[in-house]
Amino acid sequence: TRPAIAPDSMTTLLDILAPSAVIVGLEGDTKDAIIEELVDRLEVGTAISDRDKVLQAVLEREKIMSTGIGDGIAIPHGKSDAVIELTAALGIHKRGVDFEALDGEPAFVFFLLVSPANVSGPHIKALARISRMLKNDGFKKKLIEAESSADIISAIEEEEKSHSSVG
């Protein structure tokens, strides 16, 4: 578990991403299976209060428009009153999964972000930060080639340091 953070105090992605929510080798082969696998890694009782409600919120958001943003990346996200605090899960799929991305290509990197229903600012800031970091091809390559969750956490720490002066 990790300490609770105030909604506006996220300073790095690791503030919202518990090591237990990092998956190297996602197993699902459909969009829904990937989302479910990621939601299952969120900490019930700490980050979320109801796994099924959170899963439903993310799947409903996905129906509106795919969060497969292209270039091998998907950022499924949602808001729910079953989310206690802004939280995330990150998964890598070595073979790639069709996520109905804008470019039609499979996604390999999946960053799930969920936040309380009544909070927008931190959710949008976190989405922007994730998106900015994943535009760095070197960083994305490190994630895809990671052998362990520790490799992913190290890559995030390194990337965060290189952007520490940018908010």
In which residue ranges do the predicted regions lie?
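Cytosolic covalent-transfer regions centered on His/Cys nucleophiles
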Residues: 1-167
